Amino acid sequence: MKRIIEICANSAQSCVEAEAGGATRVELCAGIPEGGTTPSYGEIKTAKALTSKIDINVIIRPRGGDFLYTEAEVQSMLLDIELCKELKVHGVVFGCLTKDGDIDVPLMRRLIEAAKPLSVTCHRAFDVCRDPFTALEQLIELGCDRILTSGQQSDAVKGIPLIAELVKRADGRIIIMPGCGVRENNIGEIEAEKGAKEFHTSARSIVYSKMEYRNENVPMGSSIVSSEFETVQTDREKVKAYI
């Protein structure tokens, strides 16, 4: 089976680069420093307009932080899912937990029903759930198509033992997609160890600002941002290294 590469794309242009590099699919996100949040209508529509072959999955996450949502946040998620259906994207990506760290089955069912017929991926909320094997069976029963996971570790290489066990237990009933720390120099090891066929990675490079006048004394965001005059973007050449 051919290796399937999903790129975590932070913009419409990153989707263009991912397609040019040969990726199968993107997960389109805003708010990368927060772990990914729902992109805007304009970003999704532009990504669709500028690409023709790549599948676009859109993350549905109204904020950073935990995965315990208020009803107001759920309403926002439902509206964003409806928008994604109108824009005819390939799929949506979300995950919801209870206060006790279990999959919020009723809420996930509600969102999955709203998303039909789009593909549904459970994102790395899975990595902070209490019992991954119970969660696996619940997500299969709910009809999720895939789980994005680092094996409940800080990166997918460290999570190899759990991901391999998840692939084994899933037995083809759901796709287990390793992500977080997947690089061109370790994807072969992860593939061989886990038996996974779909992989999630960023494949980004820094894009430097073309601003000539620069006031570097006034940051626009968090102090962890290294410079106001650089961003990151999917790099088509890096994508090619995974194919």
Placement of each model-derived feature along the sequence:
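Glycine-rich phosphate-binding active-site loops on the catalytic face of alpha/beta enzymes
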Residues: 25-37, 83, 87-99, 144-157, ...
